[in-house]
Structure formats: C-alpha cells, structure tokens
Amino acid sequence: MLNPNDADDSDSSTDSSPPVAVPRPKRSATVSPSTRNSFYNSRRRSDANLNFFNERERQRERRRSMVRASRERSESRRASQQNLRKTNSEPNVDMPSIDVEALQKLLLSIPKFVSASRNRINQRHDSDSGGEMTTEIEELKDAAKSIQSLQRVLAYPSQTSSDRGGNRRLADPVESCLESSVFSDVDESSLATDTIEGRRSGISTRLGHPRGVMQFIPSIRNDQFVPTSEIRRNSISRKSSVPDGFMTSEMESEPVPNVRNRRRGIVDEMFSSSTSLLVDRPSETLAGVNRFAKLLDTFRSRPTSPEQHPSISWNPYVYSDGGEALETCGMEDSLHEADILLWKKRSRASLRRHYSVRHLAARELLDTEKSFVEGLEFLVTKYMRPLRQPLECTLIEASLVDKIFYRIPEILAHHQVLLTTLSQRIDQWHKDAILGDVLLAHFSKQSMIETYISFVDNFKFAKASIIQARQKHAFEKYYNRCCRDHPNKLDLDSLLISPIQRVPRYELIVKQMLKHTPVEHEDRERLLRAQRHIHCLAVAINQHKDGSEQMEQRLREIEAIVDGLDDLVTKDRTLLRHDIITLKGTDRERCIFMLSDLLLVTSVKKKPKVLYSKMSSQSMGFLEGNRFKLLFKVALEDVQISKDTLSQLEEVERKLESSREDDRVLKKMSQLCSLLKCERKVLMEMLETMETSNSMSIRELNEQMSSDPDLSAVHLDVLTSNGFEPFVLEFPNAEKRSVFEAMFKDAKATLAKNLLAAPSCSLKTIIAHQTRPGLQLCTATVVPGKRVDSTPSLWVCASDKFSGQVAVMALDTGEITIESCSAIGNAAVTAMCTVPPPMKLRKRKIKSQKSLEHLLNETIMDINSSGSDTESSSDEGTSTAGQTTVWIGNDDGEVFVVNSTERVRSRARDRLARLRNSITSICAANGNVLVATSYSNQVQLLLFRPASDGSWDLENPQTVGHVCQAPITSMQLIGRRVIIASGNWLHAYFVDTGKFQPPVEILPSSDVITLMYVTGQNVFLCGRKSTEVFVVDVFNLSIINHFNVVSFVRSQLSGREHILREHKMGCLRISCLTVARSHLWIGTSAGCVLSTSVQSARSQPTPDLRVCEIGHSGPCRILLPVHTPSHSNHPSRKQKRSSLNVPAQQSSQLMLVSCGEGLDDGTATQDPSTDAINHLIFWKCS
C-alpha cells in the first residue's frame, strides 16, 4: 500500500545501516550573508516500499541519525568558523535576523535623530505594520548588516572597561557597531582588536586596513585615518605596513596634549590617546567615505559639539602656533614615522646591541680625539716652541716658524677643551647619555671656524716654508730627529695636515652614532644639528682649499689674455667681476675688470674667425672670444665715488613700481566698473584717462632707466699724479650699473678693513760691520739687482764728522750677508739716493705733435679715449745701456756717483761732482737728478741732466730758481711733482715745467721739518726733536691730521728701570718715518718701533699705534722698506697709465729694515757692551 507522503526509493538506501552524515562544506568569507541557509542539507525522504510494521522503528532511527548529523554539522561549522580564511571579498556574517523594532529603539536613542526621524519612522512603521517594510528601513537594515560584517571582521570590543561591572549588558551587535562606527572619527578599519583573544588580525592592506573591508569604504583616502597609539603598537607587533599620512581632528572638549618631539621641536601629539571615549568623537570620518553616506549624514555631530573642528595634518617637524602649521616636510614626515615604527618594533636584544654600538662609537670619538690632541701637542712642544727658543732660533728664521705653525696653538686650545668635556661625559656613560650638545658647542663657535679657515688658507704656504727650511742642513738634522722621536714616526707634513683630515672623521663618527641612536632619544636632535655644522665646516674647508687655487688659475688666464698685463697674481687677490662699459664722450667699448684691490681698464677687440654670438660678459666664453689690451690700471684705494646717483636710481625704481601697481589697480577698477547697473559712462572715461596717463608715465620711466646717463653711469674720482681726475663709466643699462656700484662699495669696505689689520712681521738681526767705534748709521737706500726679477741689495752708510763708510748687504740668499764695507770721502755722509739709468727720447709714432703743456695736462680720460688702441701718442722713453747708479753726498759738497754693480773703491772719485756747499738732499726726478745744497743762508737747487752718450753730465748742472729761505732738508718725488721741505714750509716743484706751487707753512716758525715721507696722496712729516706726526694732503699741501706718540712709548717703557725710563722719555723724539704695505712705521729715539694703518693715521686724531716687541737699545735711525724681488725704477709708459698707488710690478715679499744702535727684546738679557754697536733688524711682512 502506498503512502502518499512517502517518496520513491530512488534516493533511499537499500540497506538498514544508518545513513552517513555528510559534512557541511566550508563557507568562504566571500559568501554573501543572504546565502547562508543554502548550505543546510534537505530532509531525507523515506523508502516507499517499507511495510507498516517497520515504519515506526525506521522513523525513530531516522530521528536519531538526524540528531547525530545535526550535532556533527554544528561541530564542523564551529571548526570552520574558527579557521575562517580572510579574503578581499565580502565576509560571511552568521548573525540572526535584524529586529526592526530593536533597530528603531537604537535610532531613537540618538539625540539628533530623535527630533527629525522619530515621527518619520513611526509613521512609516504604523503604515507598514501589516505589510512590507519601506525602502528606507530596508536600506537601514542593509547598512546594519554591513556594519555588523565590519564589526565581525574588525572584532572591535563593543563595550569599554567600565561596563565590566554590570552597569551595562553586552550591547547588541548592531547597536555597538553603530555606536563605534557612526559616532567615531577613529579609523575603524584599523581597529581589529579581538575581544576574546586580544589580538589583531594578521592580514592587512597596504594602507593598514584589514582585507575584506575595502568594498564598504570605496572612497577611502590615505589622509583620513589616524590610528591610536595602542593600535599603532599592535600594528607594529604584527609587522604590518604603515599608512603614508594621517589626519587628526582637534577636539574642543578634549584638547590634544603637546609632546616634545626630539627631532624638530614641539609638535602636537602624533596619535590620540587610546583611552579616549568613542562616543566623544565626531562621525565625520566614516560618514564621508562610506557608501551609506546619505543615510549617515543625518547622524552628524551631537548638540554638544555643534561645530566641526578643522582637520590638521600631523607633521612631526612643525611647531604649531595657534593651530597653524609653519612648515611642511612631507617626505621627512614619512621617513621620521618609519624610523619611529622601526625603532619601536625592535626587540630588547636589538636595542641593547644598538646602544652598545653607540657606546663604541663614542669611545672611538674619545680615543681619536686623544690621538689628535697628542699630535698637536707634539707639534707645539717638539717643533714650534724649541724653534723659537734662543738655542734653536738659529736653525730657521722666526718668520718661517710662524708661517709653518700658523694657527696650530689656537686649534690645540679648542680641541683640548673638547677632549676634556668628552672625557667627562664618556666616563659616566649610560644609555641616555648625551654628546650632541658638546659637539654642537664646539663646532658652532665662530672663533673655531675662523681658526680652521685661516689654517687652511695658510696651509700651502706652510708646506712651501717647510721645503724652504729643509734646505738648511742644521734644520734637516733637527727635522729627522723629531721624526724619529714621534711614536708613529710621522713627519712634519703628516702632522700638519691632520686638522684638515680630522673634520671629515668627525662627520663619519657622528653618522655612526646617529645610526644607532633611537629616534626618540634626547641626543638625536643635538647630534643632527652637530652633524650639519660639521658638514658645513668640511664644505667650507674644501672650498677654501680649492678656491684659492682656482682663483689663482683664473688670474693667470686673465694675465695671459690681456696684452701688457703682468704680475697680476698675488696673495689674497681675487677677481670680482668684469663688465663692458664705454667712457664718457666716446663710443668705443671698454672692458673693466674689478679685483679685490685693483681696477683694470682694457680695450676689447673680437678675435678673427670666431663666430659672433650674443653672450654674457660674465661668461668665460666672452674672455676667450675677444682680445684685450691694458689701457689703465687703478688701485682701488685711489678711487672714490664723486657723484652719488644711486639714490636717484632707487627713487626712479620706486616710482616705476608704484606706477605698475597703479596700473593693476586701474585695470581691476575698470573690470568692476563694467559690472555697474547704473550710469557709468563718466566713471569709465575717468578711468580710461587715468590709465592712459599712468601708461605714459611707465613708458617715460622705462626710457629714463635705459637712456638717462645719470642712472646708467658711475662717476668716479681717480687719484693720479695730477691729483683727482674724473673717470665716468657708462653701462648699457641701470641694472648693471647698480650691481657694479654695489660690488664696488663692498670691495672698498673690505679693502679698508684689511688695510687696518697690522701685517704679521718676524725679524732677523745682524750686526753691521764697524772698523772703529763712533760710526753712526745715517742713511740707506735700496739698489735693484742686475735684472728686473733679481733680488736687490741694501747700501747702508755710517759716518762720524770726519769720514764716511758704505756697507753693501746682499739679500739674494736665505742669509743676509755683508758683501763689502768701504770708506768713502773725508766728511760726514749726509745724503744718498738710487738713480735709475738716464733715458733718451724715441721717435713719436703719430704724425700730430702735441705741445708740452697738453702732455702735462693729459688726463686718464684722454689716454683711454684716444683713437688708437695700439700705442700711446705721448713721448715715450726707453732705457739706454747705462746702469743704475748710487749718488752719495757729504758735508764737503762732494757727490759720488757709483755703479750699482761695482764695489766702492777709490776710483769712484773719478765720477765726482764737486759743489760749493754741503749736500743736504738728493732726489731722482723723471730722468733727472735734483741736488740741494746749503751754506748758512745760501740755498741752492741744482738739476743734473743726462748727456747725449747716456752718461750723466756732472760738470754743467742747471740751477733751479726757487723761493726757499731755509735749507732744504728733504725731497720726495710723487707723480709729476717733487715735494720739498724747507724750514717749516712745504713746496711743490713740477719737473716738466720747472714751476713751483705756492708754498704752505706747516709748522711754527720756531720749528724745522726734518723728516718727511710721501706716499699716495699723503705726506707724513715731523719737526726737529718733535714727537708729533703731521699728515698733509699732497696736492693742496693742507694739514689733514696730526697725532702724538708719547703715550704709546711711555706704556712700552713702563716695565723698565726708573732711571732708564726717565732718560728715554726726557729725550724722546721721532727719528725716522716710512710707509710699507699701507702702514705707517715710526722709529723713535727710545728705540721703539711703532706702526699703524695709513687710513687710521689720516682720519683718527689718536690712531691705534702698535709697538713692535723688539727694538733697539739706542735710537732707531733708519726705517727702509725693501721689496723682493724689486721692480725696476725706470719710468715707463705703464706708469703714465696707472693711478698714484699702483706699483709698476707687484712684489712677492716685503722686508722692513730697521737700523739703530743695540738690540732690545724686552727680556733684559742682552749684553750691555753691545748697546753702542750698530744693529740691523729685518722685519719680514706677510
């Protein structure tokens, strides 16, 4: 009998064995929640052929098998849920069906939602109570399911720790999810903490978000999530990637505390606290990016926070003031965050290893510093100090010692302080020890930086001095002995270069310490700053080391391409710029080179077969593509701006800028006027008129900038032999003019500052040969060598009232030696002068003849504006085969003329001029020789001219008419005039015209000018037995300044015996004057030698006089500058093309010779018996 409720037997089992439970297939996380019921097995149908008697038993057995299968399926499902595999697709959610009424209660509990949504939800619920749910409820239900899925995957706890006490039951999944997601701006995708196991999911995306959640936040951006510090630590523990940037929200009710970031300063806290309540955070974050934003926008901030706080990007390098970021360092932010994450992720063992390596680096810094200081101490104690001792000072000159060990004591003092501080810190080492402040304090000191730079600048001169000193056998033996005494057998060169090599070593050690210093360590910021200072010092050292060589090479290139320019390369000379100019009144282009102490004006001519291309005058291609010829050379100290038009240029620029601003405003007003609805015709016409007028003003100002000569020209005054002459430079436009003038002023200021600095001098003393006591040094002169580049010799005369003696000293070797010493004449020597060989006129190279008056009045502008760029149109002179001679005069009226290459012998009497009166002064003047004689009130001035054969006509001197009433005591040539001192008057005599300038009375009538020295535009003089120096202008002979030296000498003698001090002060007077290297040198009867800059002596009523450490026991009688190698004294056409203070050839070295009685070094250790012996002190000025 068939049972209609039974199925057929096609699906049944034929045996009586219980059915095997089929395991439920594993569900993937990508399966939609709506398909979860499809995995339940269908009910098994019974067999249709079973009889009635077995029906009940089968049903019972079937029920038991179904219970077993259900139990097995439940166990399998739980196991599958525990081993759930996460993917990028939608996760499965095993949640019960959503209760709509519970969801409505949840929504009604929201304060903002109550007022707007309660009625709408109730109305729709009432209207749809018996039917289907509305679309909004369906959307809300889907949203709740999605949020439940998000909560499931993130496994975020649904209640805080305060709920554990039973005050609140476990929240419904929907309620907890809404509360934590809708009303929180925390990055929900990063809150993957498991409530049961307390762990994070091990799978995350590149942005730090768990996989499988991305479809819920499709518009997510990288800068909208900020994980809390707790989540950040969990992120590190599971080795996940870190977001590239974060966004923080500033809360009014709970301000974010500021913490100290050790890298850049005070910044906002990087991550918000993990203890902050989720309910206190706005719902801005998820609502703005979720696909249900339309619905969640109704859940905006609660009434307690009506305003949304602006989001501020977190930046660990920014010091925020008032909520505003002052700087952005995006790349450094990411790197700094990565550093923090990496250091926090390290284990304790790894941190211990890093701290250990950091300690080793600090120990290495200390050990290498000790070794470096020991090397410097070896230099000072074994080399420098012994070589300055009296026992060893004869090995090499003191000047070489100072040049070799320049700045070594200062460097040693700085590093001894650093070593002491490092030792104290490292001896008390711990993991939080700080060294950055020590290094920062050391390398940020300006004195230390200047010391290193000066040392590097002098380094190549120090090496050259070592080579020079090792040429002496005695020093070579001492040098080898010191090398053997050194622990590492290092020579002097290796020890001297150690300061330069030390600086990069500091940088390497500091980098090693930074590598092993945690990011949040207090020392890291200081180490970073110290590293920057060390790096800047290393770069400066390299620049100064290579810059001087590059500048020297560039000067040599300019010297090679400029025809007629020689000896341009000197120490500390640099090229500043070069420009194309035109001189006033001409249309020819000239090139002006501005150097640190010189101006060169040259002609410009393009080279043939060179394609012309428009290039900047500052480019090297411009120099290579043109030919240059020197026209004029001007010392920078001889130039001054005569007409200040820069202020006028600045005024025009201000007017032009104002007009341009007005033009922009008028155009904007016209645009706004066109929007008016009322009548605007009159206003539009007014605006058009104003705009037209303003445009014309702009055009006129632009034309004035380019065409006005006052704005594009620089008016200079150049000091020449004729006085100050105008020199107008016209530039292509006002901009280039302003740049040139600004650089010119800076160069003048720098040069004046350098001239104020006293030159460093060293000394060497020799004893002048004396045949008998009683001879006093009276006069000296410098005689050039046989060639222009050969070393000069020094001729010194000593005499008593009955005879004279001439000593010739050679300076061409390292040692100063006395070549010869011969007697000359039977009277006291009163005057001596070096006279260049006579000149003969050569033929003129142009057809037109110029009058003598025109040649005398020829100015710089005339020379540079001439039509020819080849040869000068004036009379030029060339030397004959004659030799340089030395003229020596005595009280008997005899003038001895001696060749510079001959020894002083009795046959010198063959060339002798016998005059009536005693000789008082001799001066060489433009190819002639002036000799002054006097007897009682008879004053005579004689002019000796060269003969036709090139010799001197000593038999027929020409008498020069004059108005001098007193004996002529001194004559000095400057330019085209000779300054003559007669009594208390100064006279100026023009050799070319034979005319005198009106004399000027300088001293009182009771005094007489006995000493005079002329340099540039200054005349320094003083009276007989006077301690006051007068400064007179060389052109108008007016007194500029005067000062006294008594106070400086008294201060120098303050430590001497009372009797000696009173004796020297009682008879104190100025005994000699000279000028060398822009410094005035003053010798006194007390034996003291003083010096000051010419600029100070000219401008200051009490200049800062520097007293030399070593002087003479008796009076200092002669001060004489000696240039080595000396330049020829022959007048040449180049001297006519130079300013007053430009020498014909730059000297490589300057020596100042001080001649006097005895030697006084301030130690009172000299033998008193040598106080009356003549000594010569050679000061070598660098």
Swiss-Prot record:
Coiled-coil ranges from the UniProt annotation: 637-669, 897-922
Pfam families in the cross-refs: PH_19, RhoGEF, WD40_2
Record-linked SMART domains: RhoGEF
GO term, biological process aspect, one: intracellular signal transduction
Compositional bias segments (type: Low complexity): 865-879
Organism: Caenorhabditis elegans
Annotated protein name in UniProt: Rho guanine nucleotide exchange factor osg-1
Tissue: Expressed in muscles in the body wall and head, and in the nervous system in neurons including FLP and ASE neurons in the head.
TM annotation in the entry: none
